[in-house]
Amino acid sequence: MPESRLQRLANLKIGTPQQLRRTSIIGTIGPKTNSCEAITALRKAGLNIIRLNFSHGSYEFHQSVIENAVKSEQQFPGRPLAIALDTKGPEIRTGRTLNDQDLYIPVDHQMIFTTDASFANTSNDKIMYIDYANLTKVIVPGRFIYVDDGILSFKVLQIIDESNLRVQAVNSGYIASHKGVNLPNTDVDLPPLSAKDMKDLQFGVRNGIHIVFASFIRTSEDVLSIRKALGSEGQDIKIISKIENQQGLDNFDEILEVTDGVMIARGDLGIEILAPEVLAIQKKLIAKCNLAGKPVICATQMLDSMTHNPRPTRAEVSDVGNAVLDGADCVMLSGETAKGDYPVNAVNIMAATALIAESTIAHLALYDDLRDATPKPTSTTETVAAAATAAILEQDGKAIVVLSTTGNTARLLSKYRPSCPIILVTRHARTARIAHLYRGVFPFLYEPKRLDDWGEDVHRRLKFGVEMARSFGMVDNGDTVVSIQGFKGGVGHSNTLRISTVGQEF
């Protein structure tokens, strides 16, 4: 009988585990962290993926982040990081208030929401511009409109005409210029990409970004539209679909079919859906991604108090840990690293929390669940990945070394959540960067030229992988390692599994 989760928890040894963290950390770079020195410090603390938030900042700013990231990379030879572009997406916002003043709105206050653009720069507490032309066509009396992440709620009283509706404030608060607007339980018909998004994606392609975090994805067609917009030059960019509204939830299965991965963006999701339900939604979506073998990111307010405080709340630590236990491949920091006072400390706390959470996982029981739930027959590569995970569990192996061109084998290995690190050896920098999306994968760039002797070339790459694992304290002489490689060069031939002993074969 495999060790159950309950048995695993009852027998836990409390303290810092003697292993490396497998959950990746994504950090948003903002004005406080946009320097080579700051990015290097974040990487040393545990950062794996840089996020560029295109809801803020100029092209010049984002260009400088990319340049600083490239400079920082030189201090980590063979360990490239990934850069992700987070689109602004099809958001709805209020207009600019008169003189940019913050408008106080008392409870029960009635006012007009208008789509008349003549009020776009002169909104006041009597009439407020909303930049969604079809607002009066999609909403009905009795529905609610949330402003500024739900800080202010309004009930729709009357549709006056095609441009105006009357609302009543449910609570008191302030409205400032250009605040976000949410329409819960209302199907909006915004295009998946705005003109700004198109320009931003073109910027990303030109500057070699590796991942797109696509905001407010509602259908599979939205994902395909982004893929088309990236064009042939951006065909290798991975698309991570952000699920942050009811439409995205309703169409999740079709989105998962076509996307490269998923981000659970709990901020906007928690506005449109009851906050307690987000807990269950997070677990459900992560499980679906795990079963599909696609990476999933948990994001929003994970260590939010550390924006201004040196220590997180206990609830925040539990939130990070539970996201890891739910099965997230990556956890993400937003304002904590973009504008916070303690960015490096936030990454350190997140890394330490993820590491301890990982030590509580009952890997054999988890592997059995994943294997049993996977439809059969599986592809050759996935069959080998599952067999490698089983071999590690049965032989108490310390590492899996995989030689890969595209990283697909490493992704499938990650799906089965082996109890050891996955050492990815690749000659392709983009493959190494993208691998940070997959839990447990440690990518290493192998730069020597390919030998004419295929067998010798394979041996040298495997030896390199074992040496890298040894240098990071993952393996030592006498340890068992499992390796996966192809019987010939090229893509899609990972079909050979080998069990070796460190210090003998390598």
From Swiss-Prot:
Domain of life: Eukaryota
EC identifiers of the protein: 2.7.1.40
Binding site for Mg(2+): E244, D268
Feature type site, description Transition state stabilizer: K242
CC cofactor: Mg(2+); K(+)
Record key words, sorted: ATP-binding, Glycolysis, Kinase, Magnesium, Metal-binding, Nucleotide-binding, Phosphoprotein, Potassium, Pyruvate, Transferase
Binding site residues for K(+): N53, S55, D86, T87
Catalytic reactions of this protein: pyruvate + ATP = phosphoenolpyruvate + ADP + H(+)
InterPro entries with a match to the protein in the record: Pyr_Knase, Pyrv/PenolPyrv_kinase-like_dom, Pyrv_kinase-like_dom_sf, Pyrv_Knase-like_insert_dom_sf, Pyrv_Knase_AS, Pyrv_Knase_brl, Pyrv_Knase_C, Pyrv_Knase_C_sf
Modified positions (Phosphoserine) in chain numbering: S24
Pathways per UniProt: Carbohydrate degradation; glycolysis; pyruvate from D-glyceraldehyde 3-phosphate: step 5/5
Classification via Gene3D superfamilies: Phosphoenolpyruvate-binding domains (3.20.20.60), PK beta-barrel domain-like (2.40.33.10), Pyruvate kinase, C-terminal domain (3.40.1380.20)
Signal sequence annotation: none
UniProt-listed CDD domains: Pyruvate_Kinase
Kinase is among the record's keywords: yes
GO MF terms held by the record: ATP binding; kinase activity; magnesium ion binding; melatonin binding; potassium ion binding; pyruvate kinase activity
Annotated control of activity: Not activated by fructose-1,6-bisphosphate.
Other facts noted in the record for this chain: Present with 2130 molecules/cell in log phase SD medium.
PANTHER family the UniProt entry points to: PYRUVATE KINASE
Summary of the function given for this chain in its UniProt record: May be used by cells under conditions in which the level of glycolytic flux is very low.
Entry protein name: Pyruvate kinase 2
Protein's gene: PYK2
